[in-house]
A protein has these predicted regions:
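Residue patterns forming the tRNA-binding/recognition surfaces of aminoacyl-tRNA synthetases
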Residues: 1-2, 14-20, 56-61, 68-72, ...
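Carboxylate/His-rich catalytic cores and anion/metal-binding grooves
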Residues: 11-64, 257, 266
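Short beta-strand segments
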Residues: 24-26, 71-74
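Phosphate-backbone binding and catalysis cores of DNA-processing enzymes
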Residues: 6-9
Protein backbone atom coordinates (compact mmCIF):
# COMPACT_ATOMS: atom_id res chain seq x y z
CA UNK A 1 0.00 0.00 0.00
CA UNK A 2 2.83 2.44 0.76
CA UNK A 3 4.91 1.64 -2.32
CA UNK A 4 5.82 4.74 -4.35
CA UNK A 5 9.12 3.89 -6.02
CA UNK A 6 11.43 1.13 -7.20
CA UNK A 7 15.10 1.43 -6.25
CA UNK A 8 17.84 0.06 -8.51
CA UNK A 9 21.59 0.21 -8.10
CA UNK A 10 22.95 2.61 -10.75
CA UNK A 11 26.01 0.41 -11.38
CA UNK A 12 24.25 -2.94 -11.76
CA UNK A 13 23.18 -4.47 -15.08
CA UNK A 14 19.46 -4.94 -15.73
CA UNK A 15 17.65 -6.89 -18.43
CA UNK A 16 14.15 -7.67 -19.60
CA UNK A 17 13.19 -11.27 -18.90
CA UNK A 18 10.62 -12.73 -21.30
CA UNK A 19 8.44 -15.41 -19.70
CA UNK A 20 7.72 -17.48 -22.81
CA UNK A 21 4.86 -19.44 -21.25
CA UNK A 22 2.90 -16.42 -20.00
CA UNK A 23 4.25 -14.00 -22.64
CA UNK A 24 5.13 -11.52 -19.91
CA UNK A 25 8.20 -9.33 -19.41
CA UNK A 26 9.95 -8.64 -16.09
CA UNK A 27 12.75 -6.18 -15.32
CA UNK A 28 15.49 -7.82 -13.22
CA UNK A 29 19.16 -7.66 -12.43
CA UNK A 30 20.95 -10.00 -14.81
CA UNK A 31 22.92 -11.83 -12.12
CA UNK A 32 19.92 -12.37 -9.84
CA UNK A 33 17.39 -13.29 -12.52
CA UNK A 34 18.07 -17.07 -12.70
CA UNK A 35 17.64 -17.59 -8.94
CA UNK A 36 14.61 -15.28 -8.73
CA UNK A 37 12.90 -17.03 -11.63
CA UNK A 38 13.64 -20.44 -10.10
CA UNK A 39 11.97 -19.30 -6.87
CA UNK A 40 8.90 -18.45 -8.95
CA UNK A 41 9.09 -21.81 -10.78
CA UNK A 42 9.57 -20.05 -14.12
CA UNK A 43 11.83 -22.17 -16.33
CA UNK A 44 10.91 -21.23 -19.90
CA UNK A 45 12.33 -17.74 -20.37
CA UNK A 46 14.86 -15.70 -22.31
CA UNK A 47 16.58 -12.33 -21.94
CA UNK A 48 15.12 -9.74 -24.30
CA UNK A 49 16.38 -6.37 -25.51
CA UNK A 50 19.70 -4.82 -24.62
CA UNK A 51 21.35 -4.77 -21.23
CA UNK A 52 21.07 -1.47 -19.35
CA UNK A 53 22.61 -0.11 -16.18
CA UNK A 54 20.40 0.94 -13.32
CA UNK A 55 21.39 4.55 -14.02
CA UNK A 56 19.74 4.29 -17.45
CA UNK A 57 16.44 3.38 -15.78
CA UNK A 58 16.40 6.46 -13.55
CA UNK A 59 12.92 8.04 -13.32
CA UNK A 60 11.40 5.44 -15.67
CA UNK A 61 7.67 5.12 -14.98
CA UNK A 62 5.76 2.01 -14.00
CA UNK A 63 2.28 1.53 -12.56
CA UNK A 64 1.48 0.27 -9.08
CA UNK A 65 0.47 -3.41 -9.26
CA UNK A 66 -2.92 -2.64 -7.71
CA UNK A 67 -4.89 -1.02 -10.51
CA UNK A 68 -7.30 0.61 -8.06
CA UNK A 69 -4.46 2.79 -6.77
CA UNK A 70 -3.84 4.31 -10.23
CA UNK A 71 -0.41 5.33 -8.96
CA UNK A 72 2.69 6.02 -11.06
CA UNK A 73 5.79 4.39 -9.56
CA UNK A 74 9.16 5.90 -10.49
CA UNK A 75 12.54 4.18 -10.64
CA UNK A 76 15.16 5.74 -8.36
CA UNK A 77 18.87 5.13 -7.94
CA UNK A 78 19.79 3.61 -4.60
CA UNK A 79 23.24 2.49 -3.51
CA UNK A 80 21.61 0.43 -0.74
CA UNK A 81 20.44 -2.08 -3.38
CA UNK A 82 22.65 -5.19 -3.23
CA UNK A 83 23.04 -8.51 -5.03
CA UNK A 84 22.40 -10.64 -1.94
CA UNK A 85 19.00 -11.87 -3.10
CA UNK A 86 15.80 -10.83 -4.85
CA UNK A 87 15.60 -9.18 -8.26
CA UNK A 88 17.81 -6.11 -7.84
CA UNK A 89 14.65 -3.98 -7.97
CA UNK A 90 13.72 -2.97 -4.43
CA UNK A 91 10.28 -1.95 -3.18
CA UNK A 92 10.63 1.60 -1.88
CA UNK A 93 8.20 3.25 0.52
CA UNK A 94 9.51 6.57 1.93
CA UNK A 95 6.78 6.52 4.56
CA UNK A 96 8.10 3.35 6.16
CA UNK A 97 11.86 3.04 5.90
CA UNK A 98 14.97 5.11 6.59
CA UNK A 99 16.80 4.10 3.39
CA UNK A 100 13.63 4.59 1.38
CA UNK A 101 13.04 8.06 2.82
CA UNK A 102 16.62 9.20 2.28
CA UNK A 103 16.64 7.98 -1.32
CA UNK A 104 13.46 9.95 -2.03
CA UNK A 105 14.65 13.10 -0.20
CA UNK A 106 17.79 13.15 -2.34
CA UNK A 107 15.60 13.43 -5.43
CA UNK A 108 13.36 16.01 -3.81
CA UNK A 109 16.34 18.14 -2.74
CA UNK A 110 17.73 17.98 -6.28
CA UNK A 111 14.37 19.12 -7.69
CA UNK A 112 13.83 15.90 -9.65
CA UNK A 113 10.73 14.76 -7.74
CA UNK A 114 8.16 16.40 -5.49
CA UNK A 115 5.52 14.07 -4.11
CA UNK A 116 3.67 13.64 -0.86
CA UNK A 117 5.12 10.83 1.24
CA UNK A 118 2.45 8.18 1.65
CA UNK A 119 2.11 6.68 5.13
CA UNK A 120 -1.09 4.59 5.30
CA UNK A 121 -0.54 3.44 8.90
CA UNK A 122 -1.82 5.32 11.96
CA UNK A 123 -0.09 5.70 15.31
CA UNK A 124 -1.74 2.51 16.56
CA UNK A 125 -0.24 0.41 13.78
CA UNK A 126 -3.47 0.06 11.82
CA UNK A 127 -4.02 0.68 8.14
CA UNK A 128 -5.83 3.91 7.27
CA UNK A 129 -8.44 4.57 4.58
CA UNK A 130 -5.58 5.58 2.29
CA UNK A 131 -4.66 1.88 2.06
CA UNK A 132 -8.07 0.97 0.66
CA UNK A 133 -11.29 -0.35 2.17
CA UNK A 134 -10.10 -3.97 2.09
CA UNK A 135 -7.19 -3.11 4.42
CA UNK A 136 -8.54 -0.23 6.50
CA UNK A 137 -8.53 -0.94 10.23
CA UNK A 138 -6.28 -3.98 10.01
CA UNK A 139 -2.93 -4.08 11.78
CA UNK A 140 0.13 -4.16 9.54
CA UNK A 141 0.50 -7.85 10.36
CA UNK A 142 -3.15 -8.63 9.56
CA UNK A 143 -2.80 -6.80 6.23
CA UNK A 144 -0.19 -9.22 4.87
CA UNK A 145 -2.64 -11.93 3.78
CA UNK A 146 -5.13 -9.62 2.03
CA UNK A 147 -2.24 -7.79 0.32
CA UNK A 148 -0.89 -11.04 -1.13
CA UNK A 149 -4.40 -12.02 -2.23
CA UNK A 150 -4.85 -8.65 -3.93
CA UNK A 151 -1.63 -9.16 -5.90
CA UNK A 152 -2.81 -12.60 -6.98
CA UNK A 153 -6.20 -11.19 -7.99
CA UNK A 154 -4.48 -8.59 -10.19
CA UNK A 155 -2.33 -11.31 -11.79
CA UNK A 156 0.80 -9.69 -10.33
CA UNK A 157 1.95 -12.45 -7.95
CA UNK A 158 4.75 -14.55 -9.43
CA UNK A 159 5.57 -16.47 -6.25
CA UNK A 160 5.69 -16.32 -2.48
CA UNK A 161 7.75 -17.81 0.33
CA UNK A 162 8.69 -17.09 3.94
CA UNK A 163 12.08 -15.62 4.81
CA UNK A 164 13.95 -15.47 8.10
CA UNK A 165 15.64 -12.11 8.60
CA UNK A 166 16.61 -9.62 11.26
CA UNK A 167 13.94 -7.11 12.29
CA UNK A 168 14.06 -4.09 14.58
CA UNK A 169 12.52 -4.50 18.04
CA UNK A 170 11.92 -2.05 20.87
CA UNK A 171 14.74 -2.29 23.40
CA UNK A 172 12.26 -1.78 26.25
CA UNK A 173 9.22 -3.94 25.54
CA UNK A 174 10.88 -6.24 22.95
CA UNK A 175 8.00 -5.84 20.49
CA UNK A 176 8.61 -5.37 16.73
CA UNK A 177 8.93 -1.76 15.61
CA UNK A 178 6.94 -0.22 12.76
CA UNK A 179 8.74 2.54 10.87
CA UNK A 180 6.58 5.57 10.06
CA UNK A 181 7.53 8.94 8.57
CA UNK A 182 6.00 11.53 10.89
CA UNK A 183 6.25 15.29 11.22
CA UNK A 184 8.77 16.33 13.87
CA UNK A 185 10.64 19.42 15.03
CA UNK A 186 14.32 19.67 14.14
CA UNK A 187 17.13 21.96 15.24
CA UNK A 188 19.75 22.82 12.64
CA UNK A 189 23.36 23.36 13.70
CA UNK A 190 24.52 24.62 10.30
CA UNK A 191 24.67 28.24 11.46
CA UNK A 192 27.10 27.49 14.30
CA UNK A 193 28.76 24.27 13.15
CA UNK A 194 32.08 25.96 12.26
CA UNK A 195 32.15 27.87 15.55
CA UNK A 196 31.56 24.64 17.45
CA UNK A 197 34.34 22.86 15.56
CA UNK A 198 36.71 25.76 16.27
CA UNK A 199 35.85 25.53 19.98
CA UNK A 200 36.60 21.80 19.94
CA UNK A 201 40.02 22.49 18.40
CA UNK A 202 40.76 25.05 21.10
CA UNK A 203 39.85 22.63 23.90
CA UNK A 204 42.34 20.30 25.59
CA UNK A 205 40.90 16.79 25.93
CA UNK A 206 41.88 14.20 28.52
CA UNK A 207 42.06 11.53 27.21
CA UNK A 208 43.08 12.97 23.83
CA UNK A 209 40.86 10.67 21.76
CA UNK A 210 37.86 12.65 22.98
CA UNK A 211 38.78 15.42 20.52
CA UNK A 212 38.29 13.33 17.39
CA UNK A 213 35.13 11.73 18.72
CA UNK A 214 33.42 15.04 19.46
CA UNK A 215 34.82 16.78 16.38
CA UNK A 216 33.58 14.08 14.01
CA UNK A 217 30.17 13.98 15.68
CA UNK A 218 29.66 17.73 15.24
CA UNK A 219 31.12 17.76 11.72
CA UNK A 220 28.79 15.00 10.50
CA UNK A 221 25.76 15.95 12.58
CA UNK A 222 22.57 16.30 10.58
CA UNK A 223 19.51 18.21 11.71
CA UNK A 224 18.73 17.19 15.29
CA UNK A 225 15.23 15.91 16.06
CA UNK A 226 14.22 17.65 19.29
CA UNK A 227 10.58 16.55 19.49
CA UNK A 228 9.47 13.44 21.37
CA UNK A 229 6.20 11.53 21.62
CA UNK A 230 6.25 11.54 25.42
CA UNK A 231 3.96 12.93 28.11
CA UNK A 232 6.95 14.24 30.07
CA UNK A 233 9.87 16.50 29.24
CA UNK A 234 10.15 20.10 28.08
CA UNK A 235 7.22 21.05 25.80
CA UNK A 236 7.72 22.73 22.43
CA UNK A 237 5.51 25.86 22.53
CA UNK A 238 3.80 25.33 19.18
CA UNK A 239 0.02 25.49 18.76
CA UNK A 240 -1.73 23.48 16.05
CA UNK A 241 -5.05 24.05 14.31
CA UNK A 242 -7.32 20.99 14.72
CA UNK A 243 -8.83 21.69 11.32
CA UNK A 244 -5.96 22.22 8.88
CA UNK A 245 -2.98 21.15 10.99
CA UNK A 246 -1.17 24.46 10.53
CA UNK A 247 0.97 25.58 13.46
CA UNK A 248 1.68 28.88 15.17
CA UNK A 249 4.94 29.59 16.97
CA UNK A 250 6.08 33.21 17.40
CA UNK A 251 8.20 35.15 19.91
CA UNK A 252 4.93 36.33 21.48
CA UNK A 253 3.48 32.83 21.95
CA UNK A 254 6.79 31.56 23.33
CA UNK A 255 6.95 34.42 25.84
CA UNK A 256 3.33 33.78 26.88
CA UNK A 257 4.01 30.09 27.50
CA UNK A 258 7.18 30.99 29.40
CA UNK A 259 5.27 33.30 31.75
CA UNK A 260 2.58 30.70 32.44
CA UNK A 261 5.11 27.94 33.13
CA UNK A 262 7.09 30.23 35.45
CA UNK A 263 3.93 30.79 37.50
CA UNK A 264 2.31 27.35 37.41
CA UNK A 265 5.08 24.91 36.44
CA UNK A 266 5.25 22.58 33.43
CA UNK A 267 1.95 20.91 34.40
CA UNK A 268 0.25 24.03 33.05
CA UNK A 269 1.13 22.84 29.56
CA UNK A 270 -0.82 19.62 30.09
Amino acid sequence: PANQYISVNPKFTYVWVHNLDADEYYLMNKELAPAALADCKIENYEFAGREMTGAEWELAEFMHPWASYNRTVYVLEGNHVTLDAGTGCVHTAPGHGVDDFEVYKKYENEGKLKQEVICPVDNKGRMTAEAGSFLEGKTVWEAEGPSISALAHEGMLLGKKSLHHQYAHCWRCKNPVIYRATEQWFASINDFREDALKAVDETRFIPSWGHDRLYNMIRDRQDWCISRQRSWGVPIPAFYCDGCGNYVITPETIESVKEIVEKEGTDAWL
